[in-house]
Design a protein with these regions (language model features):
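Secretory/organelle targeting and membrane-embedding segments
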Residues: 1-215
Length: 215
C-alpha cells in the first residue's frame, strides 16, 4: 500500500523533465528499422508531492552501451541554514551512495577540516564493501530471495497490479511526446543533454560508487 501511495503522489513529468538518447550505431543493429525512434537511454526528473519529499527532485537514468553496468542510489544532502565553516569556504554537498552493482557497497562523502590553524576543508570518504568485510560469504542470487518468498507466501517484494498500472500512467504521457533521442558514443555515460538536465539543481551524475568509475 505504501508503494502505491508514493506513486499516487508523483507529479506528472513533462518534456522539460526527460532526456532521451541513442548510442551511435544503434540504427545499424540487426533487426532495427532505419527510421526507428526507439531510445536506448533515458534520464528523468520526478517530484513526489507529499509531506516528506515535497520540493525534492529525484533524478534517474538508465541506458545501454554505457561505460559499465552500475546500479546505485545517491542522495545529495542540502546545506544546513547555519554552516560551521565561513561563507568564503567552498563546500561541496555531502553524499550518501548505496551501491548494488558492480559490487555491494555503501559510501559516505562529507567535508572535514584539514589539520592546522587555517580553515581549509577537504571531502573525505567512509566506505563499506560487502566483499571486503565478509569475504566469500555469498549474497543470495537475484531470484533466490523471490523464489523463497513465493514459497513462503510473502508478497512484500513483489509488484501488485495497481502499482504497475500507476507506473505506466506516469510513463505513457512521456512516450506520447515523441521526443527525438540525442546521440551519444558507445562506452560513455549518455548524452550531454542529460548533464544539463541535472545541472539545473547544481547537481551532477555520479558515475559508479560516487564517481569512482569516472575517476
Amino acid at each position: 500500500d505504501e508503494k502505491v501511495k508514493v506513486l499516487q503522489a508523483v507529479r506528472q513529468a513533462g518534456a522539460d523533465d526527460i532526456v532521451l538518447g541513442r548510442y551511435e550505431g544503434y540504427l545499424q543493429e540487426d533487426g532495427v528499422a532505419t527510421d526507428s525512434r526507439t531510445p536506448s537511454y533515458a534520464a528523468l526528473r520526478l517530484y513526489i508531492d507529499n509531506w516528506r519529499w515535497q520540493g525534492v527532485p529525484f533524478y534517474m537514468r538508465s541506458g545501454k552501451g554505457l561505460t559499465a553496468k552500475v546500479t546505485e542510489i545517491t542522495m545529495q544532502f542540502k546545506h544546513v541554514p547555519h554552516l560551521l565553516f565561513p561563507e568564503n569556504v567552498d563546500l561541496m554537498p555531502n553524499h550518501l551512495s548505496l551501491c548494488s552493482q558492480p559490487e555491494e557497497a555503501i559510501h559516505l562523502r562529507f567535508a572535514t577540516k584539514l589539520p592546522g590553524a587555517g580553515m581549509r576543508v577537504k571531502p573525505v570518504d567512509m566506505d563499506f564493501h560487502y566483499a571486503q568485510d565478509f569475504g566469500d560469504t555469498a549474497l543470495p542470487a537475484a531470484y533466490e530471495r523471490l523464489l523463497l518468498d513465493a514459497m513462503q507466501g510473502d508478497a512484500a517484494l513483489f509488484t501488485r497490479g495497481d502499482e504497475i498500472e500507476l507506473a505506466w500512467e506516469l510513463i505513457d504521457p512521456l512516450t506520447e511526446l515523441e521526443l527525438t533521442p540525442h546521440t551519444y558514443p558507445v562506452g560513455g555515460w549518455g548524452p550531454e543533454q542529460a548533464d544539463d538536465l541535472i545541472a539545473v539543481e547544481n547537481c551532477s551524475w555520479h558515475c559508479g560508487c560516487l564517481g569512482r568509475l569516472q575517476e
